[in-house]
Amino acid sequence: TRFGEGFQVNAAVVIGANCEFGRHVLLNRSASIGHDARVEDFASLGPGCVLCGSCRIGAGAFIGGGATLAPGVSVGANAIVGAGAVVIRDVPPGCFVAGNPARIVREGLRGYNDVGV
């Protein structure tokens, strides 16, 4: 497992084997990161979120608290996963997804402050 510069981790986080984290990644309380996950620069994972094995999180993406990502799911750069969402398919860059199963709510986001919901 490798950690980039400025990596931040809170209490009770679990990190599986062979993961890679970019620069200034934030893992909030009780997040669980499965084996072989890749989290790119400036991504943020909310409290209690679960990334199953081999997930990919793009640069600047935000994963809301309590969200669950199925094995092998990719979340594109600057995408946002709503709190409690269950993501079973890849999320394109710049999209906001929510629900169970997660569905696209908004497209064309440039970052977290651009949500407007």
Segment roles from a protein language model:
Residues N100-V117:
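Terminal amphipathic alpha-helical/low-complexity segments used for targeting or macromolecular assembly
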Residues T1-A98, A102-V105:
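Structural signal for interior beta-strand "rungs" in well-ordered beta-sheet cores
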